[in-house]
Design a protein with these regions (language model features):
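Alpha/beta enzyme core
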Residues: 1-10, 20-46, 55-69, 77-193, ...
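Short acidic, glycine/proline-enriched helix-loop-strand junctions
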Residues: 119-122, 196, 241-244
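Glycine-rich beta-strand-to-loop/alpha-helix junction loops that act as flexible
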Residues: 201-204, 224-225
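Extended, intrinsically disordered, low-complexity segments
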Residues: 236-286
Length: 286
Protein backbone atom coordinates (compact mmCIF):
# COMPACT_ATOMS: atom_id res chain seq x y z
CA UNK A 1 0.00 0.00 0.00
CA UNK A 2 1.75 3.15 -1.24
CA UNK A 3 0.35 5.30 1.55
CA UNK A 4 2.04 3.12 4.16
CA UNK A 5 5.31 2.96 2.24
CA UNK A 6 5.34 6.76 2.09
CA UNK A 7 4.70 7.04 5.82
CA UNK A 8 7.59 4.72 6.58
CA UNK A 9 9.90 6.73 4.33
CA UNK A 10 9.10 9.98 6.13
CA UNK A 11 8.89 8.70 9.69
CA UNK A 12 5.22 9.49 10.13
CA UNK A 13 2.07 7.44 10.73
CA UNK A 14 -1.09 7.41 8.66
CA UNK A 15 -4.45 7.24 10.45
CA UNK A 16 -6.45 4.08 9.84
CA UNK A 17 -9.94 5.44 10.52
CA UNK A 18 -12.73 2.96 11.13
CA UNK A 19 -16.07 4.15 9.80
CA UNK A 20 -19.60 2.79 9.96
CA UNK A 21 -21.57 4.95 7.54
CA UNK A 22 -20.90 6.96 4.39
CA UNK A 23 -21.91 10.11 6.24
CA UNK A 24 -19.33 9.51 8.95
CA UNK A 25 -16.74 8.77 6.26
CA UNK A 26 -17.56 12.06 4.54
CA UNK A 27 -16.76 13.94 7.74
CA UNK A 28 -13.49 12.06 8.15
CA UNK A 29 -12.47 12.73 4.55
CA UNK A 30 -13.32 16.42 4.78
CA UNK A 31 -10.83 16.73 7.63
CA UNK A 32 -8.17 14.82 5.69
CA UNK A 33 -8.61 17.06 2.66
CA UNK A 34 -8.47 20.21 4.79
CA UNK A 35 -5.24 19.02 6.42
CA UNK A 36 -3.86 17.62 3.13
CA UNK A 37 -3.31 14.30 4.85
CA UNK A 38 -3.35 10.82 3.32
CA UNK A 39 -5.80 8.54 5.08
CA UNK A 40 -6.99 4.95 5.27
CA UNK A 41 -10.72 4.29 5.56
CA UNK A 42 -11.35 1.02 7.38
CA UNK A 43 -14.42 -1.17 7.76
CA UNK A 44 -14.83 -3.84 10.42
CA UNK A 45 -17.16 -6.57 9.10
CA UNK A 46 -18.53 -7.30 12.55
CA UNK A 47 -19.41 -3.66 13.11
CA UNK A 48 -21.59 -3.09 10.06
CA UNK A 49 -23.20 -6.48 9.44
CA UNK A 50 -25.23 -6.80 6.26
CA UNK A 51 -24.30 -3.25 5.24
CA UNK A 52 -20.70 -4.32 4.58
CA UNK A 53 -20.84 -4.67 0.80
CA UNK A 54 -22.85 -1.56 -0.08
CA UNK A 55 -20.69 0.37 2.40
CA UNK A 56 -17.49 -0.83 0.72
CA UNK A 57 -18.90 0.15 -2.67
CA UNK A 58 -19.79 3.62 -1.44
CA UNK A 59 -16.48 4.12 0.34
CA UNK A 60 -14.64 3.15 -2.85
CA UNK A 61 -16.40 6.01 -4.64
CA UNK A 62 -15.59 8.48 -1.84
CA UNK A 63 -11.95 7.37 -1.68
CA UNK A 64 -11.45 7.70 -5.43
CA UNK A 65 -13.05 11.16 -5.47
CA UNK A 66 -10.92 12.53 -2.62
CA UNK A 67 -8.30 15.17 -3.35
CA UNK A 68 -5.77 13.39 -1.11
CA UNK A 69 -4.53 9.78 -1.26
CA UNK A 70 -7.12 7.56 0.41
CA UNK A 71 -6.93 3.78 0.73
CA UNK A 72 -9.79 1.42 1.59
CA UNK A 73 -9.05 -1.39 4.03
CA UNK A 74 -11.04 -4.33 5.42
CA UNK A 75 -10.26 -4.52 9.13
CA UNK A 76 -10.12 -7.62 11.37
CA UNK A 77 -11.50 -10.50 9.33
CA UNK A 78 -10.81 -14.22 9.70
CA UNK A 79 -13.39 -15.48 7.21
CA UNK A 80 -11.77 -16.47 3.91
CA UNK A 81 -14.98 -16.05 1.89
CA UNK A 82 -15.43 -12.48 3.16
CA UNK A 83 -11.77 -11.66 2.62
CA UNK A 84 -11.82 -12.91 -0.96
CA UNK A 85 -15.02 -11.05 -1.74
CA UNK A 86 -13.51 -7.87 -0.33
CA UNK A 87 -10.46 -8.34 -2.53
CA UNK A 88 -12.72 -8.71 -5.55
CA UNK A 89 -14.73 -5.66 -4.46
CA UNK A 90 -11.84 -3.25 -4.89
CA UNK A 91 -10.34 -2.70 -1.46
CA UNK A 92 -6.69 -1.70 -1.26
CA UNK A 93 -5.88 -3.81 1.78
CA UNK A 94 -7.24 -6.55 4.03
CA UNK A 95 -6.40 -7.45 7.60
CA UNK A 96 -6.33 -11.24 7.91
CA UNK A 97 -6.97 -11.79 11.60
CA UNK A 98 -5.51 -15.10 12.70
CA UNK A 99 -4.55 -13.78 16.12
CA UNK A 100 -6.65 -16.38 17.95
CA UNK A 101 -4.63 -19.17 16.29
CA UNK A 102 -1.18 -20.45 17.11
CA UNK A 103 1.62 -18.79 15.18
CA UNK A 104 1.92 -21.49 12.53
CA UNK A 105 -1.82 -21.66 11.82
CA UNK A 106 -1.98 -17.87 11.78
CA UNK A 107 0.76 -17.72 9.14
CA UNK A 108 -0.95 -20.38 7.02
CA UNK A 109 -4.27 -18.51 7.08
CA UNK A 110 -2.60 -15.26 6.08
CA UNK A 111 -0.63 -16.97 3.30
CA UNK A 112 -3.79 -18.53 1.90
CA UNK A 113 -5.40 -15.11 1.50
CA UNK A 114 -2.18 -13.36 0.46
CA UNK A 115 -1.98 -15.42 -2.73
CA UNK A 116 -5.28 -13.99 -3.98
CA UNK A 117 -4.66 -10.55 -2.55
CA UNK A 118 -1.27 -10.04 -4.15
CA UNK A 119 -2.56 -11.26 -7.51
CA UNK A 120 -5.12 -8.44 -7.32
CA UNK A 121 -2.64 -5.82 -6.09
CA UNK A 122 -4.15 -5.78 -2.60
CA UNK A 123 -1.95 -5.40 0.49
CA UNK A 124 -2.23 -7.82 3.40
CA UNK A 125 -2.01 -6.94 7.09
CA UNK A 126 -1.50 -9.67 9.68
CA UNK A 127 -1.37 -9.62 13.47
CA UNK A 128 1.21 -11.49 15.52
CA UNK A 129 0.24 -11.65 19.16
CA UNK A 130 -3.21 -10.82 20.39
CA UNK A 131 -4.88 -7.66 21.65
CA UNK A 132 -7.60 -7.58 24.25
CA UNK A 133 -10.42 -5.14 24.80
CA UNK A 134 -9.18 -4.67 28.35
CA UNK A 135 -6.22 -5.64 30.47
CA UNK A 136 -8.32 -6.07 33.61
CA UNK A 137 -7.79 -9.43 35.27
CA UNK A 138 -4.69 -10.43 33.31
CA UNK A 139 -1.80 -11.91 35.25
CA UNK A 140 1.69 -10.80 34.27
CA UNK A 141 2.31 -14.17 32.61
CA UNK A 142 -0.96 -14.04 30.67
CA UNK A 143 -0.27 -10.51 29.46
CA UNK A 144 3.24 -11.46 28.35
CA UNK A 145 1.90 -14.44 26.39
CA UNK A 146 -0.38 -12.15 24.39
CA UNK A 147 2.44 -9.87 23.25
CA UNK A 148 4.29 -10.13 19.95
CA UNK A 149 7.41 -12.21 20.45
CA UNK A 150 10.32 -10.65 18.50
CA UNK A 151 11.90 -14.04 17.91
CA UNK A 152 8.84 -15.16 15.92
CA UNK A 153 8.61 -12.14 13.64
CA UNK A 154 10.98 -13.03 10.79
CA UNK A 155 9.70 -16.59 10.37
CA UNK A 156 6.07 -15.48 10.59
CA UNK A 157 6.48 -12.82 7.92
CA UNK A 158 8.36 -15.17 5.63
CA UNK A 159 5.71 -17.88 5.97
CA UNK A 160 2.68 -15.59 5.76
CA UNK A 161 3.68 -13.17 3.02
CA UNK A 162 2.14 -10.28 4.98
CA UNK A 163 2.89 -6.74 3.79
CA UNK A 164 2.12 -5.07 7.14
CA UNK A 165 2.41 -6.40 10.67
CA UNK A 166 0.10 -5.37 13.51
CA UNK A 167 1.94 -5.76 16.79
CA UNK A 168 0.77 -6.43 20.31
CA UNK A 169 2.97 -4.39 22.65
CA UNK A 170 0.55 -3.53 25.45
CA UNK A 171 -1.95 -1.70 23.28
CA UNK A 172 -5.62 -2.58 23.77
CA UNK A 173 -8.81 -2.19 21.78
CA UNK A 174 -11.41 0.30 22.96
CA UNK A 175 -11.55 2.62 25.94
CA UNK A 176 -9.87 1.50 29.17
CA UNK A 177 -10.04 2.93 32.71
CA UNK A 178 -6.25 3.33 32.75
CA UNK A 179 -4.32 4.38 29.61
CA UNK A 180 -2.27 1.50 28.21
CA UNK A 181 1.49 1.45 28.60
CA UNK A 182 3.36 0.37 25.50
CA UNK A 183 6.36 -1.93 25.65
CA UNK A 184 8.56 0.34 23.56
CA UNK A 185 11.69 -1.75 23.94
CA UNK A 186 9.79 -4.71 22.50
CA UNK A 187 8.65 -2.54 19.60
CA UNK A 188 12.21 -1.38 18.96
CA UNK A 189 13.38 -5.00 18.88
CA UNK A 190 10.67 -5.90 16.38
CA UNK A 191 11.56 -2.92 14.22
CA UNK A 192 15.18 -3.99 14.05
CA UNK A 193 14.16 -7.41 12.76
CA UNK A 194 12.06 -6.39 9.76
CA UNK A 195 11.54 -3.73 7.12
CA UNK A 196 7.82 -4.57 6.90
CA UNK A 197 5.71 -1.57 7.98
CA UNK A 198 4.35 -1.94 11.51
CA UNK A 199 0.77 -1.23 12.55
CA UNK A 200 -0.60 -0.24 15.95
CA UNK A 201 -4.20 -1.08 16.78
CA UNK A 202 -6.01 0.58 19.66
CA UNK A 203 -4.62 4.05 19.06
CA UNK A 204 -7.45 5.99 20.67
CA UNK A 205 -6.28 5.72 24.28
CA UNK A 206 -2.61 6.53 23.84
CA UNK A 207 -1.03 9.71 25.16
CA UNK A 208 1.07 11.83 22.82
CA UNK A 209 4.41 10.81 24.30
CA UNK A 210 3.76 7.10 23.77
CA UNK A 211 2.35 7.69 20.31
CA UNK A 212 5.39 9.73 19.26
CA UNK A 213 7.73 7.09 20.65
CA UNK A 214 5.90 4.31 18.80
CA UNK A 215 6.05 6.18 15.50
CA UNK A 216 9.76 6.84 16.02
CA UNK A 217 10.24 3.08 16.42
CA UNK A 218 8.61 2.14 13.14
CA UNK A 219 4.83 2.35 13.51
CA UNK A 220 3.49 3.55 10.15
CA UNK A 221 -0.27 3.07 10.60
CA UNK A 222 -2.32 3.64 13.73
CA UNK A 223 -5.90 2.44 13.89
CA UNK A 224 -8.46 4.81 15.40
CA UNK A 225 -12.03 3.80 16.09
CA UNK A 226 -13.35 4.67 19.54
CA UNK A 227 -12.81 8.42 19.51
CA UNK A 228 -14.18 8.85 15.98
CA UNK A 229 -17.24 6.76 16.74
CA UNK A 230 -17.82 8.65 19.98
CA UNK A 231 -17.50 12.03 18.26
CA UNK A 232 -19.94 11.11 15.51
CA UNK A 233 -22.42 9.66 18.01
CA UNK A 234 -22.21 12.76 20.18
CA UNK A 235 -22.89 14.90 17.13
CA UNK A 236 -26.00 12.89 16.38
CA UNK A 237 -27.21 13.09 19.97
CA UNK A 238 -26.54 16.78 20.60
CA UNK A 239 -29.52 18.34 18.85
CA UNK A 240 -32.64 20.35 19.55
CA UNK A 241 -35.95 18.81 20.56
CA UNK A 242 -37.31 18.78 17.00
CA UNK A 243 -34.25 18.83 14.76
CA UNK A 244 -34.06 18.73 11.01
CA UNK A 245 -32.28 15.58 9.91
CA UNK A 246 -29.92 17.46 7.60
CA UNK A 247 -28.85 19.64 10.53
CA UNK A 248 -28.26 16.63 12.76
CA UNK A 249 -26.11 14.93 10.13
CA UNK A 250 -24.19 18.12 9.44
CA UNK A 251 -23.40 18.47 13.14
CA UNK A 252 -22.28 14.85 13.34
CA UNK A 253 -20.01 15.23 10.30
CA UNK A 254 -18.50 18.35 11.81
CA UNK A 255 -17.91 16.57 15.12
CA UNK A 256 -16.17 13.57 13.59
CA UNK A 257 -14.24 15.92 11.32
CA UNK A 258 -12.89 17.81 14.32
CA UNK A 259 -11.88 14.54 15.99
CA UNK A 260 -10.16 13.41 12.79
CA UNK A 261 -8.28 16.71 12.54
CA UNK A 262 -6.88 16.14 16.01
CA UNK A 263 -5.82 12.61 15.08
CA UNK A 264 -4.07 13.84 11.94
CA UNK A 265 -2.22 16.49 13.92
CA UNK A 266 -1.11 13.97 16.53
CA UNK A 267 0.11 11.49 13.92
CA UNK A 268 2.08 14.09 11.98
CA UNK A 269 0.45 13.30 8.63
CA UNK A 270 -0.83 16.81 7.85
CA UNK A 271 0.62 18.15 4.61
CA UNK A 272 1.97 14.79 3.45
CA UNK A 273 -0.42 14.66 0.51
CA UNK A 274 0.92 17.78 -1.19
CA UNK A 275 3.73 17.94 -3.76
CA UNK A 276 6.75 19.46 -2.09
CA UNK A 277 5.65 18.17 1.32
CA UNK A 278 7.57 15.62 3.35
CA UNK A 279 6.73 12.83 0.91
CA UNK A 280 6.39 13.36 -2.83
CA UNK A 281 5.65 9.65 -3.23
CA UNK A 282 2.52 9.92 -1.13
CA UNK A 283 1.18 12.75 -3.25
CA UNK A 284 1.41 10.43 -6.24
CA UNK A 285 0.04 7.36 -4.43
CA UNK A 286 -3.28 7.24 -6.25
Amino acid sequence: MDIIVGARATGHAVPGCNVYTLDQAAGVLAAAEAARSPLILQVHPGGVGAALWPLIAGLRVLADAASVPVALHLDHCADIVTLRRAIASGVDGVMVDGSTLDTGANARLVALVATDAHAAGVAVEAELGRLSGSEDGWTVAAREAQLTQPGEVAEFLSASGADMLAVSIGNVHGATPVPPRLDLSRLASIGRLTDVPLVLHGGSGLDDAQLDAAIARGICKVNVNTELRAAYSAGLAGHDAAPELVDVLSRARSAVGSATSQVIERFGSAGLADPGGPSREMADAR
